[in-house]
């Protein structure tokens, strides 16, 4: 054994350098969060639970153009349009999304000309049965009402990049 290796083993240089490395990381802020109680901020482009939005006067935005249904690669969206109204517009009678099929690609949101269907900020929507993951129009509108403030803020932050 040579003198250098003997000196290193007696002086425990690897141990001391490892100790200082551990102490350096010990006093830095932790990257881990306490998840149920703390949540990381999400991006304005985050794609979570779907929602149907309303206009400020309370009327639903969806004009039953069926672009979202046509563009959906997973064929998770089903729409039935109602008859035309006196003013020439129409609304949906049925708007269903099968969340089991949905791949959260965001194509429906991009295709919508009136920003009616959006993917909101909610990512905690676990269910106990598959039937609960079949969203009808009432549930989608309720999601839109619940998350409207966050959705509007995210859309306004993302507007320069659209």
Swiss-Prot record:
Residues of the 4Fe-4S ferredoxin-type domain: 52-82, 93-122
Q: Supply the PROSITE patterns for this chain.
A: 4FE4S_FER_1, 4FE4S_FER_2
* Topology of this chain in the membrane: Peripheral membrane protein
User: GO biological process annotations for this chain's record?
Assistant: aerobic respiration
First-listed, main subcellular location of the protein, grouped into a coarse class: membrane
Cofactor requirement: [4Fe-4S] cluster
Give the record's GO CC terms.
plasma membrane
Q: Where in the cell is it found?
A: Cell inner membrane
Reading the lineage from the top rank, the first entry is Bacteria
Q: Name one Pfam family in it.
A: Fer4_7
Q: Which residues bind [4Fe-4S] cluster 2?
A: 72, 102, 105, 108
Does Transcription regulation show up as a keyword for this record?
no
Binding locations of [4Fe-4S] cluster 1: 62, 65, 68, 112
Q: Does the keyword Membrane apply?
A: yes
Query: Which Gene3D superfamilies would you find in this protein's record?
Result: 3.30.70.3270
Any single GO molecular-function term of the entry would be: 4 iron, 4 sulfur cluster binding
- Record-listed E.C. numbers: 7.1.1.-
List UniProt keywords, sorted A-Z.
Answer: 4Fe-4S, Cell inner membrane, Cell membrane, Iron, Iron-sulfur, Membrane, Metal-binding, NAD, Quinone, Repeat, Translocase, Ubiquinone
List the catalytic activities from the record: a quinone + NADH + 5 H(+)(in) = a quinol + NAD(+) + 4 H(+)(out)
Q: Tell me how the cofactor is bound.
A: Binds 2 [4Fe-4S] clusters per subunit.
EC top class named in words: translocase
What subunit structure does UniProt give?
Answer: NDH-1 is composed of 14 different subunits. Subunits NuoA, H, J, K, L, M, N constitute the membrane sector of the complex.
The entry assigns this protein to a family as follows:
Belongs to the complex I 23 kDa subunit family.
As for what it does, the entry says: NDH-1 shuttles electrons from NADH, via FMN and iron-sulfur (Fe-S) centers, to quinones in the respiratory chain. The immediate electron acceptor for the enzyme in this species is believed to be ubiquinone. Couples the redox reaction to proton translocation (for every two electrons transferred, four hydrogen ions are translocated across the cytoplasmic membrane), and thus conserves the redox energy in a proton gradient.
What is the protein named? NADH-quinone oxidoreductase subunit I 1
Q: Which organism is it from?
A: Rhodopseudomonas palustris (strain ATCC BAA-98 / CGA009)
UniProt lists the gene as nuoI1
């Amino acid at each position: 054994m040579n003198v250098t290796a003997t000196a290193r083993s007696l002086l425990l240089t690897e141990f001391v350098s490892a100790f200082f490395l551990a102490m350096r990381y010990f006093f830095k802020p932790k990257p881990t969060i306490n998840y149920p109680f703390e949540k990381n901020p999400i991006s304005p482009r985050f794609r979570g639970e779907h929602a149907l939005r309303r206009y400020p006067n309370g009327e639903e935005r969806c004009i039953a153009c069926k672009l979202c249904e046509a563009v959906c690669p997973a064929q998770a969206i089903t729409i039935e349009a109602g008859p035309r109204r006196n003013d020439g517009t129409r609304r949906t009678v049925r708007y269903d999304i099968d969340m089991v099929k949905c791949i959260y690609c965001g194509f429906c949101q991009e295709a919508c000309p009136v920003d009616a269907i959006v993917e909101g900020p909610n990512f905690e929507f676990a269910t106990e049965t598959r039937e609960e993951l079949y969203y009808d129009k009432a549930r989608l509108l309720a999601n839109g009402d619940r998350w409207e403030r966050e959705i509007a803020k995210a859309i306004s932050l993302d507007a320069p990049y659209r």
